[in-house]
Amino acid sequence: MTTNSSFFDEHIAMIYSNLMDQYMPEYFKSFEYTPWVFSLLGSVVIGLSGIFPLIIIPTEEKMAKEGYKDPADSKLLRVLLSFAVGGLLGDVFLHLLPEAWEGDNQDPSSHPSLRSGLWVLSGILIFTIVEKIFSGYASADEENPQPKCVEIANCLLRRHGGQLPEGETSESCGGACDIEDVGKVCFLREQEQKSKERKEQPKKVAGYLNLLANSIDNFTHGLAVAGSFLVSFRHGILATFAILLHEIPHEVGDFAILLRSGFSRWDAARAQLLTAGAGLLGALVAIGGSGVTSAMEARTSWIMPFTAGGFLHIALVTVLPDLLKEEERKESIKQLLALVFGIALMAVMTMLFEH
């Protein structure tokens, strides 16, 4: 195994040297291999996978043509949400937790898996508390809706010689008093106001919780990419490729969760790119702590189980209950198959790229 690995490295080095000699300008030939540059580039490439779902998920206009005024009602989006649940569960039980337990088993002084279990429960509990707090604010806003159109009463009074209520002026009718069919005018104005309120409806806290969990997850990806490039260029390329393949289906599921939470397509894409900044931060931390690898691993060992707890909350508490309300048998089967496919895809990624 070692002989094959060294032969591979020598072969790659020879090809690299030939390409440099034949095609690269003299200015670039003086550059040496700098792991921190490739670490940041790898993290950026992985972060750009956040815009990939824009290609797959249809636009709001296309959904409207299909009869879905709310993107959350789209059958395709519900299938993607099922895929997201499967991907999250597969990521938790086939990648995050096994890696966390492996780290716990290396410490003979601690009870195996106890620390990881506590961090998983902490992640679930903290995400639950945050969602309860912000859901309470949202419920309070829903219980105090905006007043309905009152111009009808005022305008009718005006037309029939009545008096406007004290403090009201003719401007409150917006000039609608001179139009014969006052009721329809006011009704249209009320509908416009309601439509505007729907557009400005605050995004659900589940979307922000998902972004928080993804930021923490991307931080660990940055650590892994930078750590691999510090070992060798070949290890770094393989790690970047493996994480990228792992992230693309993950990003599609995350994108669907953000759409369900009230984000527009472009808002969701921008938010996904912002979470990629955590990957750059993770890469910088790994580079800065490259001389104290064991100490850094000890300090960041809680991140994976905590993220697993957050993913479990999002998948089983936030997304899955809505999917269970599906009444059409055909759609339920499609959603179940998408969930299983999400788990299977994460299993394949784990078998191919985890060591």
Curated annotation (Swiss-Prot):
Summary of the function given for this chain in its UniProt record: Involved in zinc transport and homeostasis.
Protein family membership: Belongs to the ZIP transporter (TC 2.A.5) family. KE4/Catsup subfamily.
Cellular localization per UniProt: Basolateral cell membrane; Golgi apparatus membrane
Residues bearing carbohydrate: N4, N218
Protein name: Zinc transporter ZIP13 homolog
Transmembrane segments: 37-57, 79-99, 118-138, 273-293, 301-321
Species in which this protein is naturally found: Drosophila melanogaster
Superkingdom in the source lineage: Eukaryota
Keywords in alphabetical order: Cell membrane, Glycoprotein, Golgi apparatus, Ion transport, Membrane, Transmembrane, Transmembrane helix, Transport, Zinc, Zinc transport
Gene Ontology cellular component annotations, sorted alphabetically: basolateral plasma membrane; endoplasmic reticulum; Golgi apparatus; Golgi membrane
One annotated GO biological process: intracellular zinc ion homeostasis
InterPro entries hit by this protein: ZIP
Membrane topology listed for this record: Multi-pass membrane protein
Pfam families xrefs: Zip
Gene Ontology MF annotations: iron ion binding; iron ion transmembrane transporter activity; zinc ion transmembrane transporter activity
